Amino acid sequence: MINQIKTYLLMALLVGLIYAICMMLHIHPLIAIILALIPNVIAYYMSDKLVLMSYNARILEEHEMPWLHQMVERVARKAGLPKPKVAIVPTETPNAFATGRNPENAVVAVTEGILKLLSPEELEGVIGHEISHIKHRDILISTIVATLAGAIVMIAEWMLYWGGIFFVSEEEESNPLELIGTILLLILAPIAATIIQFAISRQREFYADEEGAKLTHPLWLANALAKLERGVELYPLERGNPATAHMFIINPFRKDFIAKLFSTHPPTEERIERLLEMCKRIGK
């Protein structure tokens, strides 16, 4: 229920943001409403397909990697969910993510790199983490946040390029305050997008770690996270949209100082410590 409320709030924020920008650009209110609603329709019905497409992910048929299908089905059954589709991402960056608007339309995507790096038990721990996201409907929030974050940056670029050029008549004098506002939006938009991801992602990852570990084994996931952290450092994702970073189990992009400051994920060391503490509590 809480995640559904968050989803509606995010969608309302996206509508309000785009509508306000359209008003600043002197677009007709009816057209502005249509433009504001389109991203939400896309976010709800197509964002999972767009995310998979952006990473050249391919849905695996049942006869392809049957052992992986069986693993996903086994963990999903423990969670009381239908088996999600399984996709493969052609990159050496070891990682995984889940997407889709609900458990009935979910996809678990794994990279070629993660299949090479992890043992079957460690991979099952990762699958448990992603299945937990699906069970608690984090995946719709993730895809909408990715759309919202991307939209914020895109709108800022629109305003810089179009503001005062296409939507201001020759008779109107340009307003220096609008120009200043446009420049400020361009500067602050990426920060705002990251803050939105930051607010949604960090606690969600801790919870998915714990719930996913209950479906499999906390030590399996702890070992997997340690390997993935090192693997991403060696093989960071060179191509991709940073607005989707929060969807992955580990941030797949190269981490400079600023990226670490505004990280969309909690520190991997802290996640591992929590899982090891969980091992002690349950005696595994």
UniProtKB/Swiss-Prot annotation:
Q: Name one GO molecular function term.
A: zinc ion binding
- Biological process annotations from GO: proteolysis
Binding locations of Zn(2+): 129, 133, 205
InterPro entries named among the record's database cross-references: HtpX_protease, Pept_M48_protease_HtpX, Peptidase_M48
Q: Cross-referenced Pfam families, in alphabetical order?
A: Peptidase_M48
Q: How does it sit in the membrane?
A: Multi-pass membrane protein
Q: Which UniProt keywords apply?
A: Cell membrane, Hydrolase, Membrane, Metal-binding, Metalloprotease, Protease, Transmembrane, Transmembrane helix, Zinc
Active-site residues?
130
EC number(s) of the enzyme? 3.4.24.-
Cofactor mode of binding and number, as noted:
Binds 1 zinc ion per subunit.
Task: Say yes or no: keyword tRNA processing present.
Answer: no
Q: Which sequence ranges are marked TM in the entry?
A: 7-26, 33-47, 148-168, 180-200
**Gene Ontology terms: cellular component:** plasma membrane
Enzyme class, one word? hydrolase
The prosthetic group or cofactor this protein requires is: Zn(2+)
> Which compartment or compartments is the protein found in?
Cell membrane
| HAMAP family per UniProt | Pept_M48_protease_HtpX (MF_00188)
Q: Which family does it belong to?
A: Belongs to the peptidase M48B family.
UniProt protein name: Protease HtpX homolog
Native organism is Methanocaldococcus jannaschii (strain ATCC 43067 / DSM 2661 / JAL-1 / JCM 10045 / NBRC 100440) (Methanococcus jannaschii)
